[in-house]
Amino acid sequence: MNCLNEINSEGFVVIEDVFSGEEIKKIILEIEKITSSEVENSTFRKSEDLFAIRQFHKEVPESLKFIFNSNLLKIIKSIKGEGSFITKSIYFDKPEKSNWFVSYHQDLTISVNKKIESENFKNWTVKQNQYSVQPPVSILDSAFTVRIHLDKTTKENGALKVLNGTHKNGVIRVENIDSKNEVETICEVGEGGV
């Protein structure tokens, strides 16, 4: 499975059926085990419009054996080879009737376990006891995001919108994004796709 050409050209790729229905059920079950208690957790965010878990891989570690199945491992290897590791993981559950909109943006930060002032690492923040920082462009260029779909995502219920090829333009300030002159793709993905 080699999706590198499409990623290099467009900046993204949609791959269906990475996870079976049974694997999705197991991932959801692990999430439900953790979230069913009423215990407050600083990495959980819950409102009418959103439920989120920051540091997902630390909060729901039992899910990792289902997430890193042979299909996903092949995809990761085809993109980056050996040695990839998690720098950030967030779980979002957006209720069907919520009107939650995410504007165009670039993921510019990575999570780190402590703050060490270093050249070209900037815009430090702390969210739910987790440090985040914008690393140098060379590190950003070597990172990639995997968005795992636990249910079908369409343009009506929150599919990711991307501007094709803009990853080649480096870091772009939000006010400089000219979406009218870019090709937009709405990434509709079925349950179990990435």
Summary of predicted features, one role per range:
Residues N2-E10, F19-E191:
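Non-heme Fe(II) oxygenase catalytic core, chiefly the N-lobe of the double-stranded beta-helix
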